[in-house]
Amino acid sequence: MRGNGISGFDMSMQDTPNAVRLHIGIFGKRNSGKSTLLNAITKQKVSTVSPVAGTTTDPVSKAMELHGIGPVVFYDTAGFDDEGELGRLRVEKTEEVLQKTDIAILVFRELDISWEMKWYAKLKEKQIPVLCIWNAATADRDHAMDTIQKLERKTGGEILVVNAAEDMAAEPVRQALIRLLPSEFTEETITGHLVTANDLVLLVMPQDIQAPKGRLILPQVQTIRDLLDHKCIVQSCTSDTLEAALSALAKPPKLIITDSQVFPLVYEKKPEESLLTSFSVLFANYKGDIQYFIQSAKAIDQLHADSKVLIAEACTHAPLAEDIGRVKIPAMLKKKYGDSLQVDIVSGTDFPKNLQEYNLIIHCGACMFNKKYVLSRVEQAKQEGIPMTNYGIAIAYMKGILEHIIY
């Protein structure tokens, strides 16, 4: 949670973070027109287009504002029928995009649709809304009509027929995406369930070695923006000025949001009537499965000297002396269970395909991931029967104050 500093005038401050954009994945066989379609939608040459099958290798992403939806990020993927050893690796990258896809565009072009139907089933299994597009020039549509009608019967929905090479393909695709927009994309907020207009909220934000000079970390920025959107009165302080900040206020804040690592300090000094939470806990609710995280925190008591814990960070950064995930949480666990307790750390999109060797997973707040991606990891943990919790939840549990915080 602490590794993503953003400065006042850099691109991160000007653009909506990808983590809160709607993720739209474009899938299909090689040479089905995926890249051509993306270029038509964005009205830019985002992806290289070639008659040679397999032009797209690693996924290509493009962030943009889509009228009627808002901030989105498109992913153009390698064909899922790619062949050979390199092809297998490309398909694995395509599978990774699947884990964070909110809406899928499945592009059809050939009469043999067996590959596409396998992926359609995979998308439906993951409960991902699917927009099926038949890419064909006008002159070729009659030839494919029987297959298109067969596809409509199999999917139970309308198949959008467009020519991806034409600019006019973008508008019907945009309208179809609006119809598929998941309700939670527009309804969920970070703090909206805890605050109302004119509430006073105090943010306690230690400016330690992990917060680069002149910057706030991304979870703090996103939370401040969310509070302002809800018409709250936002005050802020560092942990060492908490008492002075509280004394300066005319009334106790309704809510105090702190960095998880100073939970005990803030809990001890907060007014009795003020609610307490942390940025990490808020993001556990916003991005993950908060009930599973809370339930899984109890697994900390079941650890022993030979246990193995996986710590997962969404961002990639060089470890620092006060790093909460790489230093502080492992130190807390080893203080209780001994140095022989093994702690593995993964970052970015790295995540084990097999979790069976672990007794517990502790995930960061995932400010760099969208909710779909976090929940795909939670679902994997659930299916393998492995407890999974979150930095803030784990710290609150180990400090004995979990029942006193709000989420």
Each language-model region and where it sits:
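Conserved G1/Walker A P-loop phosphate-binding module
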Residues: 2-88, 96
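C-terminal effector/interaction modules appended to NTPase cores
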Residues: 5-7, 11, 29-35, 214-407
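C-terminal end of P-loop GTPase domains and the immediately downstream helical coupling element
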Residues: 23, 163-228, 233-250, 309-312
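Short, flexible loop segments at the rims of nucleotide/cofactor-binding pockets, characterized by
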Residues: 51, 80-86, 108-112, 139, ...
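Conserved C-terminal guanine-recognition region of P-loop GTPase G domains, centered on the G4
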Residues: 62, 66-70, 89-159, 218-227, ...
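G-domain G4 guanine-recognition motif of GTPases
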Residues: 77, 108-111, 128-144, 160-168, ...
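Structural alpha-helical scaffold elements that stabilize or flank donor/cofactor-binding regions
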Residues: 90, 94-97, 194, 249, ...
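Canonical P-loop GTPase G-domain recognition
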Residues: 128-131, 136-193, 277, 387-397
